[in-house]
């Protein structure tokens, strides 16, 4: 029987990975620190009772050592995410926590045979674009000075023409233009480099925007579908940054879990980052409108001229590589939204945490506003 450790296994993706592995006959151990920002009510009821559960932090050396004992394959999902203003915590959890896990495996000569690490589309600075003159280009992040003028478009780095969004391949430049994105670059590079040095197979899955049942209703810093739903269910308008026409690639969580299992069981992706997504870009405004219609709550989204520096305008994943080995998303956006709404309506005491969080981000300089110019 294969023995797996799922770090972050109480969260959205980790818990679905654990469920899938249990169904497939794996012996599963879950490690999660039950971060209060995500798990405000403590241990969630959905943790699989056929999996061993360890409540603890991967930054604690003894805890991660115990969690790794007799493990064959690690699904490293644990991360601190979103746009929260705690820079040091991102680095401690995402970068140093990952480094410590790798150190412990080597130090104790543990029999780990593979690591699948959760990366993110946030590693890209901006999605790929098609320039009328230069073809596919990889623009840099849009300058703050441009955004302050309300110019949201992405321009060709060679001729400044407005580009058309196209799917972004894995060979696009990475760098991360947010603290979260930067630490996800750290995570994937650490794991892939360590794999090359040790000869232990590793693969980094660059997830698109993942949503579905169990997405935290308490965390106002990440998960646009959850944030919009909690706003609407409190009779508040979803707040759109920029003009709402920015696009994202959305993936249902069960599809992401299947991608993890596929990556664990094939050697065709080893040693590299791999995009996982639907391959389709959807405007954020459309997401807000679909949720409003599905919930039957007629509240138009609010656009107030705010933006977040470093945020990409468009990102759709080029999923050619993972599709070539048999991956195909099963759940489209309409079905996924319907299933998420069924789940969130079953939750109690749904509150709006976004309003307070947005004010914190403004005060911390993470959210900016368009500067109006006189005549």
Which residue stretches match the model-derived regions?
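Glycine/proline-rich active-site loop of Rossmann-fold NAD(P)-dependent oxidoreductases
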Residues: 185, 198-200, 210-226, 234-237, ...
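Non-catalytic, hydrophobic alpha-helical segments
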Residues: 256, 260, 276, 287, ...
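N-terminal Rossmann-like NAD(P)+-binding domain of SDR-like oxidoreductases, especially those catalyzing
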Residues: 1-208, 364, 375
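Hydrophobic "lid"/C-terminal helical patch
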Residues: 17, 260-264, 291, 319, ...
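C-terminal "lid/loop" region of Rossmann-like NAD(P)-dependent oxidoreductases
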Residues: 243, 273-274, 282-289, 296-314, ...
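Conserved active-site helix of classical SDR/Rossmann-fold NAD(P)-dependent CH-OH oxidoreductases
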Residues: 98-99, 185-192, 225-229, 258, ...
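A conserved structural motif in NAD(P)-dependent oxidoreductases
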Residues: 251-255, 332
């Amino acid at each position: 029987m294969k023995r797996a450790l799922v770090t972050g296994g109480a969260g959205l993706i980790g818990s679905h990975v654990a469920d899938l592995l249990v169904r497939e006959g794996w012996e599963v151990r879950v490690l999660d620190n039950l971060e209060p920002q995500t798990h405000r009510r403590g241990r969630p009821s959905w943790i699989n009772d056929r999996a061993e559960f360890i409540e603890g932090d991967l930054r604690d050396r003894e805890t991660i050592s115990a969690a790794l004992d007799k493990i064959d394959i690690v699904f490293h999902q644990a991360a601190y995410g979103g746009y929260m203003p705690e820079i040091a915590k991102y680095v401690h959890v995402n970068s140093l926590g990952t480094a410590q896990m790798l150190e412990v495996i080597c130090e104790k000569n543990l029999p780990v045979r593979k690591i699948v690490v959760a990366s993110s589309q946030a590693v890209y600075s901006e999605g790929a674009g098609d320039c009328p003159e230069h073809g596919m280009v990889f623009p840099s992040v849009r300058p703050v000075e441009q955004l302050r003028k309300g110019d949201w478009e992405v321009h060709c780095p060679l001729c400044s023409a407005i580009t058309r969004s196209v799917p972004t391949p894995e060979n696009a430049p990475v760098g991360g233009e947010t603290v979260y994105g930067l630490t996800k670059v750290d995570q994937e590079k650490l794991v892939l480099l360590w794999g090359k040095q040790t000869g232990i197979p590793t693969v980094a899955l660059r997830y698109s925007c993942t949503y579905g049942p169990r997405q935290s209703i308490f965390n106002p810093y990440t998960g646009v579908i959850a944030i919009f739903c909690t706003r609407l269910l409190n009779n508040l308008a979803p707040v759109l940054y920029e003009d709402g026409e920015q696009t994202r690639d959305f993936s249902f969580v069960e599809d992401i879990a299947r991608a993890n299992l596929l990556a664990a069981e094939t050697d065709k992706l080893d040693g590299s980052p791999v995009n996982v997504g639907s391959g389709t870009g959807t405007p954020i405004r459309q997401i807000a409108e679909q949720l409003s219609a599905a919930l039957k709550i007629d509240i138009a989204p609010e656009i107030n001229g705010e933006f977040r520096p470093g945020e990409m305008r468009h990102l759709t994943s080029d999923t050619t590589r993972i599709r070539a080995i048999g991956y195909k998303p099963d759940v489209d956006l309409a079905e996924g939204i319907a299933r998420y709404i069924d789940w969130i309506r079953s939750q109690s005491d749904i509150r709006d945490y976004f309003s307070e969080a947005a004010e914190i981000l403004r005060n911390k300089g993470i959210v900016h506003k368009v500067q109006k110019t006189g005549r």
